[in-house]
Amino acid sequence: ADLKGLDLSGLNLDKANLISAILTGANLKGISLVGANLFSVKAMRADFSGANLSGANLLKANLTRTKLQESNFNDADMTGINLSDADMRKTDLTRAKLVEANLPGVDLTGADLSEAKLTGRYQREGYFSRGANLKKGVLVGAKMQGADASGTDMVETDCTDVDFTNANLSEANFKHARLKSTCFVNTKLGDADFRGANVIDCDFSGAELIEAKFQGVDLSSVKNISAEELQSSQIDSETKIPDYIEVNWTSEDTYE
């Protein structure tokens, strides 16, 4: 169906079949699409502000540069979706499936991604693909408690005030990310890469840091990082350690 540029605001299209529909530039403000099938839909630059898409199927949909503020994607399947440069401020993505999602430049300020899944997946060829791409995104104040975001790409992403409590971020890439007052309480961060990241006032209480890469990172202001976990991570003589942990360097890359 070609619905390009149409005004569909406020309509109830629950459980509608819109497979491969063209919604480019359409006005879908406040629309209800609960449980709808939007597989492979093209909705670039459309306005979904305040829309309800809970439980919808958005596999491989293209929502580049869409407006999605305060919309509801509870339990939606968004595997392989393209949300590049989308405005998703205050969006509810609780338990949403964002496997292999492409979200570079997305604005998720104040969004709720509790228990969302942002991982890669096993391909037929037998290899595991990378997690969601959130490169250069804005996640200020987002809730990501219990989210599975292993392997997620957060290079240069702004994660100020994000709550990652109990999340799985193993192998996540935080290179050059902004991590100010970010909460990593009980977070799995094994093999995560923090090199070049701006890490200020973050809480690492109970975080798992095996092989996490902190070479050259300033950790002087972080809270509750345990000496034991830090020892299991990768640091070097350029890493700035908090005052409450004592490290004696015996050579450039060994310490006691």
Feature locations, PLM:
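Tandem repeat scaffolds
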Residues: 1-256
